[in-house]
């Protein structure tokens, strides 16, 4: 992963790098996926690992893409974040060890969670492109 990760890091734009590598936060309502409604999956911009599905996305009125759960729990790590004078739970990509966003206990759904994720940490794969992009094993989610 190291050489591949180094290559992908060089391909990131300034905001993507700031968010994923320096635990930054992009502006609300001024990011690619905050109101994105197309069906598909959201993958880690660095590792390419599937992280979230449009089926679990909802409008939290916060200005960032929000999800009720990750696609696979083993792909995300949670860590206590005491920055900015707050205590929050940071969400990180396990494979790439990059910052994704935060999870809050104020979401809808059975778990009551809201995964508030920076668009800059994600790449969207439309459901019709899952096969050609190498995520064909996830097509069943949209049947």
UniProtKB/Swiss-Prot annotation:
The keyword Oxidoreductase applies. InterPro entries: Met_Sox_Rdtase_MsrB, Met_Sox_Rdtase_MsrB_dom, Mss4-like_sf. Gene3D superfamilies: Peptide methionine sulfoxide reductase. The keyword Oxidoreductase applies. Keywords: Oxidoreductase. Pfam families: SelR. One of its GO terms (molecular function) is peptide-methionine (R)-S-oxide reductase activity. The active site is at 116 (nucleophile). Its EC number is 1.8.4.12. One of its GO terms (biological process) is response to oxidative stress. It catalyses: L-methionyl-[protein] + [thioredoxin]-disulfide + H2O = L-methionyl-(R)-S-oxide-[protein] + [thioredoxin]-dithiol. Residues 5-127 form the MsrB domain. GO terms for cellular component: cytoplasm. It comes from the Bacteria. Belongs to the MsrB Met sulfoxide reductase family. NCBIfam families: peptide-methionine (R)-S-oxide reductase MsrB. This is Peptide methionine sulfoxide reductase MsrB. The lineage of its organism: Bacteria, Bacillati, Bacillota, Bacilli, Bacillales. The gene is msrB.
